[in-house]
Amino acid sequence: MTVLIHVLGSDIPHHNHTVLRFFNDTLAATSEHAREFMVAGEDNGFTESCPALSLRFYGSKKALAQAVIAKAKANRRQRFFFHGQFNTSLWLALLSGGIKPAQFYWHIWGADLYEVSNGLKFRLFYPLRRIAQGRVGCVFATRGDLSYFARQHPDVRGELLYFPTRMDPSLNAMAKECQRAGKLTILVGNSGDRSNQHIAALRAVYQQFGDTVNVVVPMGYPANNQDYIDEVRQAGLALFSAENLQILSEKMEFDAYLALLRQCDLGYFIFARQQGIGTLCLLIQADIPCVLNRDNPFWQDMAEQHLPVLFTTDDLNEQVVREAQRQLASVDKSGITFFSPNYLQPWHNALRIAAGEAE
């Protein structure tokens, strides 16, 4: 029997760390198909912190892709589980036959599904990638992303799967510790990545609430982002008084991030694609409602779980926010499909499907 190989095809330390720790701590002990990884980027202590996994690291996305293609060609029974996939060479290999559809299983993280960049090289590549994605053996994704993908590729199998957000089920009641009165505090974006469209989001918040709310913008990740942070701060201070705007430029530890979320009343996410599920989960867990772009298909997942959804096009005010908080507080968090531990069983199913052990 050929063991399934997992591929992290781009050097995204935060996401890769989350996936590797999840596999090491939760899946590796019960499945031999959860232990082999090929990773783009440096070790960064992963080998030491994930002793249950067999990890191979590659200095570039291209080097990793070449190694995957060589393995795929050498053994056509070898199957790969691709997580995310911000790797042009791998899509081209699937398109050209270097990797066969029966070898290619893909967990959609969001960015590689949507065509949001206006750069010329991206606009030229998107049609090729779209064709290649129609050759995937099976995709795993959120409900909203599965719906989006199926409109383009109705013949490709799709299975529900959620990114393994680090969650403590005992915190499902942490909202009881939160204060829900006074001036609203609004979290804008889930990181410092430009995909959060921070400036547009700040303008939208100002248009809805004026300079009457506290605005918190977490921008400690990714690193080496000071120019963009300064740009966002300047734009924010043109809208909000200094005491109402908090730009967080330092990376935060998980417990500190949870403490920050407990101070918030609303999350505001203007991006038009699925991303930031981890932050959304932690907000929902704390009974903090989220404002989404109507083009972000994750609203379908939230509605399926009977969670209140606010949209950027809604008329928002404190009364609307407090009512959404009340509705969230009435939801039994233990039954939410994309919360831990409920997302575990779909992961076990996904491993069996990708390994060829389940129909």
Curated annotation (Swiss-Prot):
It comes from the Bacteria. Transmembrane segments: none annotated. Catalyzes the synthesis of Und-PP-GlcNAc-ManNAcA-Fuc4NAc (Lipid III), the third lipid-linked intermediate involved in ECA synthesis. This is TDP-N-acetylfucosamine:lipid II N-acetylfucosaminyltransferase. It comes from Salmonella newport (strain SL254). It catalyses: beta-D-ManNAcA-(1->4)-alpha-D-GlcNAc-di-trans,octa-cis-undecaprenyl diphosphate + dTDP-4-acetamido-4,6-dideoxy-alpha-D-galactose = alpha-D-FucNAc4-(1->4)-beta-D-ManNAcA-(1->4)-D-GlcNAc-undecaprenyl diphosphate + dTDP + H(+). GO terms for cellular component: plasma membrane. GO terms for molecular function: 4-acetamido-4,6-dideoxy-D-galactose transferase activity; fucosyltransferase activity. Keywords: Cell inner membrane, Cell membrane, Glycosyltransferase, Membrane, Transferase. It is found in: Cell inner membrane. It is an enzyme of class 2 (transferase). Belongs to the glycosyltransferase 56 family. It is a peripheral membrane protein. Pathway: Bacterial outer membrane biogenesis; enterobacterial common antigen biosynthesis. Its EC number is 2.4.1.325. One of its GO terms (biological process) is fucosylation.
